[in-house]
């Protein structure tokens, strides 16, 4: 019995030590060895309770970055504009992963970046590398907060040095935060669009779109499943005042726009799902 107790205690102590070691190594990687050594005492105090930052053997990166930022330990400013490379990795190779990442980058103010490479490796992992020039590193707190809004889970973050960062993200249960949820039998009136309307629906059978007076709407409607795989596309080459269509099975998202130009629906559209 006492031997069993010793084994259990030893296991707990080893796990705690391992968690602390992994956490401290990660903090050192994020802020750099020089700053880590300079602020070692403060870091030891801030991350003393590892259970706040590691749950089920998974580092809670948003909490780690928040703690570093709130205590002045996350230096994002560069001495001059630099080329910055961000590598995103996702085991979900569907278009939804890319869509969410692209939307998030735009949402946090990064509209001028270009793709260095995009590929799927032997393990069917999506790897997307982007480049942009800036005086500040990409703020991980802002990025991770936006990803969380889309129910995307950050698995790993690595500072690779030379202004290169790596983010491994789980999109398995992700949902488009930019899509507007519409309940069955709810009528939603949309104002002048800045981009296509993206809708989120559940178990609806039909979609009705009503155009406003003085619009010249040429319907363009796309139905997607939960992974943003296209299920059906509708394009009409004449003006409609209204349009009703049966929703394909397994539809999760619907894009409603104009076939030619958003100016044709500048007075907005109304949508009803049933």
Language-model region placement:
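Gram-negative bacterial Sec-dependent N-terminal signal peptides
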Residues: 1-23
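C-terminal edge strands of extracellular/lumenal beta-sandwich accessory domains
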Residues: 24-53, 60, 72-93, 144-182, ...
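Short, ordered beta-strand-loop transition motifs
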Residues: 46-49, 74-84, 118-126, 191, ...
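Long, acidic and serine/threonine-rich low-complexity regions
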Residues: 48-50, 62, 102-105, 128
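Extended low-complexity, serine/threonine- and proline-enriched intrinsically disordered segments
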Residues: 83-108, 209-211, 218-227
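Long, charge-dense tracts
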Residues: 104-125
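Noncatalytic modules at the cell exterior or secretory-pathway interfaces
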Residues: 125-131, 137-155, 164, 204-208, ...
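C-terminal, beta-strand-rich globular interaction domains
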Residues: 178-274
């Amino acid at each position: 019995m006492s031997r069993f107790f010793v084994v259990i205690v030893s296991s707990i102590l080893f796990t705690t030590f391992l968690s602390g070691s992994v956490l401290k190594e990660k903090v050192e990687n994020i802020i750099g060895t020089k700053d880590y050594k300079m602020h070692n005492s403060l870091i030891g105090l801030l991350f003393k309770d590892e259970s706040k930052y590691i749950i089920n053997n998974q580092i809670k990166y948003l909490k780690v970055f928040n703690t570093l930022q709130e205590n002045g330990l996350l230096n994002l400013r560069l001495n001059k504009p630099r080329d910055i490379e961000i590598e995103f990795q996702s085991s979900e190779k569907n278009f939804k992963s890319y869509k969410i990442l692209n939307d998030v980058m735009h949402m946090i103010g990064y509209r001028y970046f270009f793709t260095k490479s995009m590929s799927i490796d032997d393990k069917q992992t999506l790897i997307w590398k982007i480049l942009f020039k800036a005086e500040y590193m990409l703020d991980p707190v802002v990025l991770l907060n936006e990803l969380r809004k889309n129910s995307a889970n950050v698995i790993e973050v690595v500072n690779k040095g030379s202004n290169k960062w790596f983010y491994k993200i789980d999109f398995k249960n992700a949902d488009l935060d930019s899509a507007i949820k519409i309940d069955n039998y709810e009528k939603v009136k949309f104002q002048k669009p800045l981009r296509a309307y993206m809708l989120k629906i559940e178990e609806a059978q039909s979609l009705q779109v009503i155009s406003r007076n003085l619009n010249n709407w040429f319907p363009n409607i796309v139905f997607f499943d939960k992974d943003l795989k296209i299920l059906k596309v509708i394009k009409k080459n004449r003006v409609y005042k209204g349009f009703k269509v049966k929703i394909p099975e397994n539809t999760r998202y619907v894009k409603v726009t104009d076939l030619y130009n958003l100016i044709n629906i500048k007075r907005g559209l109304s949508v009803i799902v049933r």
